[in-house]
Amino acid sequence: TCEIAKEMGAEVIQHEWPGNQAEQFNWLIDNVSINTKWILRLDADEYLMPDLIAELNEKLPTMDEGVSALSLSLARAYCGKILHHGIVNGIRIVRIFRTGKARYDKRIMDEHLSILDGKTIEMKHQFVDDNRLTIGQFTIKHENYASREAAILLDAEYHLSDTSKLEKDHGEEVEKKRAQKAKYAKMPLFWRAFGYFIYRYIVKGGWRDGKEGFLWDFLQGWW
């Protein structure tokens, strides 16, 4: 990724991995001189849809100064196909914010931006998380996620770390997602993974995305 970015003319800054995305991005905010009004956080396997690029080009130059962050609609692609069914649609994430107006909260995963001041507005069009991992790579990645989720659940149950300084206001959708995870953790072991897969694939219609939808929901549900 770094070599491709350099070839395309981008300035590449590297920093030793601190163990989680939140600390890495906050290091960037604190230590790198950023001379743009807005920051876009985009992973190597993500891209903006042409309609979103056009929308941003139209709205950013005249954006109200009271707006500090933009919430983008997330689309997911797996095995080269954009998924349209299941629970992949309707998710919104703040990925664009004014320089100096936001930081990531300190979590080992499921990190979210805390907007320091100003309001957040929604953009109409989507960006895409284009997952190109093999099944083997996918399961290894999600085993790592599962270990970190387990650590978060143990921390929440036994109060192993001080969470009093964490920002609480991440928006209704983020808090809803975390509440759902807490509810899931209280469900019967093993059965909850099976139930989650059935919910995603049958109830929410993931089956309508064909074999890509089955693989996506099966791997997400069981891993």
Positions of the model-derived regions?
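Acidic donor-binding segment of Leloir-type glycosyltransferases
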Residues: 1-14, 18, 57-60
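Alpha-helix termination/capping residues and helix-transition junctions
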Residues: 7, 33, 64-66
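A short, glycine-/small-residue-rich helix N-cap motif at loop->alpha-helix starts
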Residues: 16-23, 29
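Catalytic-site signature of metal-activated, phosphate-bearing donor transferases
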Residues: 22-26, 49-223
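Active-site nucleotide-sugar/metal-binding loop of Leloir-type enzymes
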Residues: 26-38
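Conserved acidic residues
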Residues: 37, 45, 66-68
